[in-house]
Regions:
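Terminal-proximal interaction/regulatory segments of ATP-powered molecular machines
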Residues: 1-79
Length: 79
């Protein structure tokens, strides 16, 4: 299965689907072919990765945040 993640980057940060995929691949080492269901909004985006990659992605962004709120978190379930 896949995990849906939220990232606090969007169009105002000059991101589109292509740039977000490149950024995620470069930052996490996750092959962009494994990143799916990308939705880029104005100030945030969503993407899906396989469960086993999700923990790695969350951990990497948690470490990069230096104790501040991480750029990436689990997306809240759709109501």
């Amino acid at each position: 299965g896949t995990a849906r993640l939220f990232i606090a980057k969007g169009k105002v940060d000059n991101f589109d689907t292509h740039k977000l995929l490149d950024f995620l691949e470069k930052t996490t080492g996750v092959n962009k072919r494994n990143i799916d269901d990308v939705k880029v909004m104005d100030s945030f985006s969503f993407f899906a990765v396989p469960y086993e990659e999700a923990e790695k992605v969350l951990k990497i962004f948690q470490q990069k945040s230096g104790g501040k709120k991480s750029l990436v978190s689990r997306a809240k379930a759709k109501k």
